[in-house]
Amino acid sequence: RTLTQGVEEPLEQARRFYDYITLNVKYAYSRAYFCLEDIPDACARNLRGDCGMMALLFITLCRCAGIPARWESGWKAEPGFCGAHDWAQFYAAPYGWLYADPSFGCGAAREGNEARRQHYFGNLDPFRMAANTQFQADFDVPMDHWRADPYDNQVGEMELRDRALEYGEFLRSKEVLECTEVS
């Protein structure tokens, strides 16, 4: 309530949440999510978290304020680089669903780039490939065994008849083959 005290407009409330996270939370790689009892709470209490933890904290704060918010994750893919990444969406009438990327905003704040920090509230860069629109979503083809990453899988999984394979048991790779500007 303190973050949104005196603010009724959902867009401005969401901005306050984004500002709080990007200006106070430090990026840090996390333990496996199954080791954390409450992921957004861990991020809020420790003021540290990875991209998924920051996105979940933003989503949780929005939802607590009555602002619809949801998860999106996939890859950040640009010439020469491809890596897993998580971000959020929130709903603000009359604009509809908007993006927020607290961890990229946090990185911009750390670098002193306020324009870029502001950009990641309401916008994303064009180098995204969305793979998941829900946190802890089931696969379209259900697995018969325990999943390696039941929280946020962006790279796929494999299983045999008698067990699932762990990530170190099969080869996987990703590569940006082409980046083309479209108009």
Give residue spans per PLM region:
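Secondary-structure boundary elements
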Residues: 1-46, 158-182
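Sequence-level detector for tyrosine residue identity
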Residues: 17-20, 27-29, 33, 58, ...
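Low-complexity, Gly/Ser/Thr/Pro-rich intrinsically disordered linker/tail segments
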Residues: 122-183
